[in-house]
Design a protein with these regions (language model features):
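C-terminal cap/linker of serine protease catalytic domains
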Residues: 270-326
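Active-site region of chymotrypsin-like
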Residues: 186-200, 227-288
Protein backbone atom coordinates (compact mmCIF):
# COMPACT_ATOMS: atom_id res chain seq x y z
CA UNK A 1 0.00 0.00 0.00
CA UNK A 2 2.82 2.38 0.91
CA UNK A 3 4.49 1.73 -2.44
CA UNK A 4 1.23 2.42 -4.24
CA UNK A 5 0.86 5.72 -2.41
CA UNK A 6 4.44 6.69 -3.28
CA UNK A 7 3.98 5.78 -6.95
CA UNK A 8 0.71 7.71 -6.96
CA UNK A 9 2.39 10.80 -5.53
CA UNK A 10 5.23 10.55 -8.07
CA UNK A 11 2.73 10.21 -10.91
CA UNK A 12 0.77 13.21 -9.63
CA UNK A 13 3.88 15.40 -9.36
CA UNK A 14 5.06 14.26 -12.80
CA UNK A 15 1.68 15.06 -14.35
CA UNK A 16 1.52 18.51 -12.75
CA UNK A 17 5.07 19.25 -13.93
CA UNK A 18 4.62 18.06 -17.49
CA UNK A 19 1.01 19.14 -18.04
CA UNK A 20 1.88 22.70 -19.19
CA UNK A 21 4.55 21.35 -21.54
CA UNK A 22 2.20 18.75 -23.02
CA UNK A 23 -0.59 21.34 -23.38
CA UNK A 24 1.74 23.70 -25.23
CA UNK A 25 2.74 20.90 -27.58
CA UNK A 26 -0.83 19.80 -28.25
CA UNK A 27 -2.36 23.27 -28.22
CA UNK A 28 0.39 25.77 -29.02
CA UNK A 29 -0.36 29.35 -28.03
CA UNK A 30 -1.14 31.50 -31.03
CA UNK A 31 1.62 34.02 -31.65
CA UNK A 32 0.77 37.66 -32.33
CA UNK A 33 1.09 38.94 -35.87
CA UNK A 34 4.26 40.85 -36.66
CA UNK A 35 3.70 44.60 -36.77
CA UNK A 36 4.91 46.06 -40.06
CA UNK A 37 4.18 49.69 -40.85
CA UNK A 38 3.62 50.48 -44.55
CA UNK A 39 6.49 52.02 -46.46
CA UNK A 40 6.46 55.79 -46.62
CA UNK A 41 5.07 57.40 -49.73
CA UNK A 42 7.35 60.04 -51.18
CA UNK A 43 6.01 63.53 -50.77
CA UNK A 44 4.61 64.86 -54.06
CA UNK A 45 4.94 68.52 -54.87
CA UNK A 46 2.13 70.28 -56.79
CA UNK A 47 4.15 70.41 -60.01
CA UNK A 48 4.63 66.63 -59.89
CA UNK A 49 0.86 66.14 -60.00
CA UNK A 50 0.58 67.43 -63.58
CA UNK A 51 -0.60 64.86 -66.10
CA UNK A 52 2.42 63.68 -68.08
CA UNK A 53 0.45 62.94 -71.26
CA UNK A 54 -1.08 66.41 -71.47
CA UNK A 55 0.11 68.45 -74.45
CA UNK A 56 2.78 70.99 -73.62
CA UNK A 57 1.48 74.53 -74.23
CA UNK A 58 3.62 77.16 -75.87
CA UNK A 59 5.42 79.68 -73.66
CA UNK A 60 3.02 82.44 -74.75
CA UNK A 61 -0.04 80.31 -73.97
CA UNK A 62 1.40 79.38 -70.57
CA UNK A 63 2.10 83.02 -69.66
CA UNK A 64 -1.39 84.14 -70.73
CA UNK A 65 -2.94 81.27 -68.75
CA UNK A 66 -1.03 82.19 -65.59
CA UNK A 67 -1.97 85.87 -65.92
CA UNK A 68 -5.63 84.94 -66.42
CA UNK A 69 -5.64 82.59 -63.43
CA UNK A 70 -3.98 85.19 -61.21
CA UNK A 71 -6.56 87.79 -62.25
CA UNK A 72 -9.42 85.39 -61.52
CA UNK A 73 -7.99 84.46 -58.13
CA UNK A 74 -7.41 88.08 -57.20
CA UNK A 75 -10.97 88.98 -58.23
CA UNK A 76 -12.38 86.23 -56.02
CA UNK A 77 -10.20 87.29 -53.09
CA UNK A 78 -11.25 90.93 -53.48
CA UNK A 79 -14.89 89.90 -53.16
CA UNK A 80 -14.29 88.03 -49.89
CA UNK A 81 -14.65 90.08 -46.72
CA UNK A 82 -13.37 88.27 -43.63
CA UNK A 83 -14.67 89.14 -40.20
CA UNK A 84 -14.59 87.72 -36.67
CA UNK A 85 -17.23 85.14 -37.61
CA UNK A 86 -14.88 83.61 -40.17
CA UNK A 87 -12.18 83.53 -37.49
CA UNK A 88 -14.55 81.72 -35.14
CA UNK A 89 -15.54 79.26 -37.88
CA UNK A 90 -11.90 78.42 -38.46
CA UNK A 91 -11.35 77.55 -34.82
CA UNK A 92 -14.61 75.63 -34.65
CA UNK A 93 -13.46 73.54 -37.62
CA UNK A 94 -10.11 72.87 -35.94
CA UNK A 95 -11.85 71.88 -32.72
CA UNK A 96 -14.14 69.46 -34.56
CA UNK A 97 -11.09 67.98 -36.27
CA UNK A 98 -9.30 67.58 -32.92
CA UNK A 99 -12.27 65.64 -31.52
CA UNK A 100 -11.79 63.15 -34.35
CA UNK A 101 -8.08 62.88 -33.56
CA UNK A 102 -8.87 62.34 -29.87
CA UNK A 103 -10.32 58.93 -30.77
CA UNK A 104 -6.75 57.73 -31.40
CA UNK A 105 -5.57 58.92 -28.00
CA UNK A 106 -5.67 57.13 -24.63
CA UNK A 107 -5.04 58.34 -21.11
CA UNK A 108 -2.36 56.29 -19.35
CA UNK A 109 -2.43 55.97 -15.56
CA UNK A 110 0.69 54.58 -13.90
CA UNK A 111 0.45 53.42 -10.27
CA UNK A 112 3.63 52.83 -8.27
CA UNK A 113 4.12 51.83 -4.62
CA UNK A 114 6.47 53.87 -2.46
CA UNK A 115 7.51 54.04 1.19
CA UNK A 116 7.64 57.17 3.30
CA UNK A 117 10.24 57.84 6.01
CA UNK A 118 8.11 55.88 8.51
CA UNK A 119 8.25 52.84 6.16
CA UNK A 120 4.55 53.16 5.47
CA UNK A 121 3.59 52.12 1.96
CA UNK A 122 1.57 54.47 -0.19
CA UNK A 123 0.55 54.54 -3.83
CA UNK A 124 1.49 57.26 -6.26
CA UNK A 125 -0.34 57.91 -9.51
CA UNK A 126 1.09 59.48 -12.62
CA UNK A 127 -0.85 60.31 -15.76
CA UNK A 128 0.25 60.73 -19.33
CA UNK A 129 -1.17 60.25 -22.80
CA UNK A 130 -0.54 57.69 -25.51
CA UNK A 131 -1.67 56.97 -29.04
CA UNK A 132 -2.93 53.64 -30.42
CA UNK A 133 -0.54 52.68 -33.22
CA UNK A 134 -1.22 49.03 -34.06
CA UNK A 135 -3.17 45.84 -33.49
CA UNK A 136 -1.20 42.58 -33.76
CA UNK A 137 -4.24 40.32 -33.61
CA UNK A 138 -3.91 39.73 -29.88
CA UNK A 139 -3.03 43.12 -28.45
CA UNK A 140 -3.61 46.80 -28.99
CA UNK A 141 -0.26 48.60 -29.01
CA UNK A 142 0.06 52.08 -27.56
CA UNK A 143 2.98 54.48 -27.92
CA UNK A 144 3.54 56.62 -24.84
CA UNK A 145 6.04 58.44 -22.64
CA UNK A 146 8.57 56.20 -20.88
CA UNK A 147 9.25 58.37 -17.83
CA UNK A 148 5.73 58.09 -16.48
CA UNK A 149 5.42 54.30 -16.72
CA UNK A 150 8.97 53.02 -16.20
CA UNK A 151 8.56 52.27 -12.47
CA UNK A 152 4.85 51.60 -12.40
CA UNK A 153 3.58 48.40 -10.84
CA UNK A 154 0.14 48.81 -12.38
CA UNK A 155 -0.66 50.51 -15.68
CA UNK A 156 -4.19 51.32 -16.82
CA UNK A 157 -5.31 52.91 -20.04
CA UNK A 158 -8.57 54.72 -20.68
CA UNK A 159 -9.74 54.80 -24.29
CA UNK A 160 -11.61 57.76 -25.77
CA UNK A 161 -15.00 56.18 -25.04
CA UNK A 162 -14.20 55.64 -21.36
CA UNK A 163 -13.33 51.93 -21.59
CA UNK A 164 -10.51 51.02 -19.19
CA UNK A 165 -8.08 48.11 -19.43
CA UNK A 166 -4.87 46.90 -17.86
CA UNK A 167 -1.70 47.47 -19.89
CA UNK A 168 1.75 45.91 -19.86
CA UNK A 169 5.10 47.32 -20.95
CA UNK A 170 6.06 45.63 -24.20
CA UNK A 171 9.31 47.49 -24.97
CA UNK A 172 11.03 50.77 -24.15
CA UNK A 173 13.78 52.93 -25.58
CA UNK A 174 15.90 55.04 -23.25
CA UNK A 175 17.33 57.33 -25.92
CA UNK A 176 14.01 58.58 -27.27
CA UNK A 177 12.15 58.13 -23.95
CA UNK A 178 9.40 56.13 -25.67
CA UNK A 179 7.54 53.03 -24.51
CA UNK A 180 5.13 50.72 -26.29
CA UNK A 181 2.36 49.34 -24.08
CA UNK A 182 0.19 46.34 -24.89
CA UNK A 183 -3.46 45.82 -23.99
CA UNK A 184 -4.87 42.32 -24.42
CA UNK A 185 -7.80 42.25 -26.83
CA UNK A 186 -9.41 39.68 -24.53
CA UNK A 187 -9.89 42.47 -21.99
CA UNK A 188 -12.03 44.48 -24.42
CA UNK A 189 -15.60 43.45 -25.20
CA UNK A 190 -16.41 42.72 -28.85
CA UNK A 191 -18.82 45.64 -29.11
CA UNK A 192 -16.17 48.05 -27.81
CA UNK A 193 -13.40 46.80 -30.10
CA UNK A 194 -15.03 48.53 -33.06
CA UNK A 195 -14.76 51.86 -31.22
CA UNK A 196 -10.97 51.67 -30.84
CA UNK A 197 -9.30 53.66 -33.61
CA UNK A 198 -5.72 53.07 -34.75
CA UNK A 199 -3.66 56.05 -35.87
CA UNK A 200 -1.61 56.05 -39.06
CA UNK A 201 2.08 56.92 -39.13
CA UNK A 202 2.64 59.54 -41.80
CA UNK A 203 5.89 61.00 -43.11
CA UNK A 204 8.12 63.78 -41.86
CA UNK A 205 10.15 63.89 -45.07
CA UNK A 206 8.47 67.03 -46.36
CA UNK A 207 9.88 68.84 -49.35
CA UNK A 208 8.80 72.04 -47.66
CA UNK A 209 7.98 71.53 -43.97
CA UNK A 210 7.84 75.16 -42.83
CA UNK A 211 4.28 76.44 -42.94
CA UNK A 212 2.67 72.99 -42.73
CA UNK A 213 -0.40 73.10 -40.42
CA UNK A 214 -0.26 70.67 -37.47
CA UNK A 215 -2.39 69.78 -34.46
CA UNK A 216 -0.75 68.82 -31.15
CA UNK A 217 -2.65 66.17 -29.16
CA UNK A 218 -2.09 64.50 -25.80
CA UNK A 219 -0.94 66.93 -23.14
CA UNK A 220 1.21 69.45 -25.04
CA UNK A 221 0.38 72.16 -22.50
CA UNK A 222 1.27 69.91 -19.57
CA UNK A 223 -2.46 69.59 -18.88
CA UNK A 224 -4.25 66.28 -19.41
CA UNK A 225 -6.24 66.28 -22.64
CA UNK A 226 -4.98 69.64 -23.87
CA UNK A 227 -4.43 70.42 -27.54
CA UNK A 228 -2.84 73.07 -29.72
CA UNK A 229 -3.08 74.32 -33.30
CA UNK A 230 -0.36 75.90 -35.36
CA UNK A 231 2.23 75.19 -37.99
CA UNK A 232 5.76 73.88 -38.39
CA UNK A 233 8.00 76.93 -38.12
CA UNK A 234 11.30 75.21 -38.89
CA UNK A 235 12.69 71.76 -39.66
CA UNK A 236 16.37 72.59 -39.96
CA UNK A 237 17.17 71.41 -36.43
CA UNK A 238 18.92 68.18 -35.46
CA UNK A 239 18.79 66.40 -32.11
CA UNK A 240 21.88 64.25 -31.52
CA UNK A 241 21.36 61.01 -29.62
CA UNK A 242 23.41 57.84 -29.32
CA UNK A 243 23.88 56.31 -32.79
CA UNK A 244 21.34 58.65 -34.36
CA UNK A 245 20.53 62.21 -35.34
CA UNK A 246 16.85 63.07 -35.29
CA UNK A 247 15.10 65.78 -37.29
CA UNK A 248 13.31 68.21 -35.00
CA UNK A 249 10.21 70.14 -36.02
CA UNK A 250 9.94 73.47 -34.23
CA UNK A 251 6.36 74.72 -34.14
CA UNK A 252 4.76 78.04 -33.29
CA UNK A 253 2.47 76.32 -30.76
CA UNK A 254 2.93 77.52 -27.20
CA UNK A 255 3.22 74.60 -24.80
CA UNK A 256 4.88 73.35 -21.65
CA UNK A 257 8.46 72.28 -21.07
CA UNK A 258 6.98 69.02 -19.77
CA UNK A 259 4.42 68.71 -22.56
CA UNK A 260 4.08 65.36 -24.34
CA UNK A 261 1.97 63.95 -27.13
CA UNK A 262 1.95 63.73 -30.91
CA UNK A 263 1.69 66.03 -33.91
CA UNK A 264 -0.94 65.26 -36.55
CA UNK A 265 -1.16 66.74 -40.02
CA UNK A 266 -4.51 67.68 -41.56
CA UNK A 267 -4.80 64.22 -43.15
CA UNK A 268 -5.07 62.55 -39.72
CA UNK A 269 -1.53 61.13 -39.82
CA UNK A 270 1.13 61.29 -37.13
CA UNK A 271 4.07 63.38 -38.37
CA UNK A 272 5.96 63.89 -35.12
CA UNK A 273 6.34 62.82 -31.49
CA UNK A 274 6.49 65.76 -29.08
CA UNK A 275 9.78 65.84 -27.20
CA UNK A 276 10.87 67.58 -24.01
CA UNK A 277 14.39 67.98 -25.40
CA UNK A 278 14.94 71.64 -26.19
CA UNK A 279 17.15 72.78 -29.06
CA UNK A 280 17.51 76.27 -27.57
CA UNK A 281 16.98 77.88 -24.13
CA UNK A 282 14.63 80.35 -25.81
CA UNK A 283 12.37 77.54 -27.05
CA UNK A 284 11.30 76.14 -23.67
CA UNK A 285 7.70 77.32 -24.11
CA UNK A 286 7.37 76.22 -27.73
CA UNK A 287 6.37 72.71 -28.76
CA UNK A 288 8.91 70.73 -30.77
CA UNK A 289 8.70 67.18 -32.06
CA UNK A 290 10.91 64.44 -33.48
CA UNK A 291 9.96 63.64 -37.08
CA UNK A 292 8.08 60.35 -37.34
CA UNK A 293 10.16 59.11 -40.30
CA UNK A 294 13.25 58.86 -38.10
CA UNK A 295 11.29 56.92 -35.46
CA UNK A 296 9.27 54.62 -37.72
CA UNK A 297 11.65 51.62 -37.65
CA UNK A 298 12.32 52.01 -33.92
CA UNK A 299 8.59 52.06 -33.15
CA UNK A 300 8.06 49.03 -35.39
CA UNK A 301 10.77 47.07 -33.55
CA UNK A 302 9.40 48.05 -30.14
CA UNK A 303 5.91 47.01 -31.26
CA UNK A 304 7.34 43.56 -31.96
CA UNK A 305 9.09 43.42 -28.58
CA UNK A 306 12.59 43.83 -30.01
CA UNK A 307 15.34 45.54 -28.05
CA UNK A 308 17.02 48.60 -29.51
CA UNK A 309 20.70 47.85 -30.07
CA UNK A 310 23.18 50.74 -29.85
CA UNK A 311 26.87 50.87 -30.70
CA UNK A 312 27.31 53.86 -28.41
CA UNK A 313 28.44 56.57 -30.83
CA UNK A 314 27.41 60.12 -30.02
CA UNK A 315 27.93 62.84 -32.62
CA UNK A 316 28.80 66.47 -31.90
CA UNK A 317 29.11 69.57 -34.05
CA UNK A 318 32.64 70.80 -34.67
CA UNK A 319 33.99 73.99 -36.17
CA UNK A 320 35.41 74.11 -39.69
CA UNK A 321 38.90 74.64 -38.24
CA UNK A 322 38.62 71.56 -36.04
CA UNK A 323 37.34 69.49 -38.97
CA UNK A 324 40.28 70.52 -41.15
CA UNK A 325 42.74 69.53 -38.42
CA UNK A 326 41.36 65.98 -38.24
Amino acid sequence: VAMAVIFGMIACVTFLTLEPVISNLLYPEEKPDAVIFPEEQEEISPEDMLVEDAPTPSIQEAVESVILEDEQIQKILDEIVLDKNNYAQLYNALYEYSTILSEYMVEVTAVSSNEDWLSDTYEKEGKTYGVVIANNGREYLILTDRNTVKQAGIIRVTFHDGVQAKAERKQSDVQTNLTVLSVSMDDISDEKKDDIKIATLGSSNFRQAAGTPVVAMGSPLGISGSMGYGMIASSGITLSKVDANYKIFATDITGSASGIGVLFNLQGQIVGIITTDRYSPDSKNMISAIGISELRKLIENMSNGKDAVYVGISGIDVTTEAHEEM
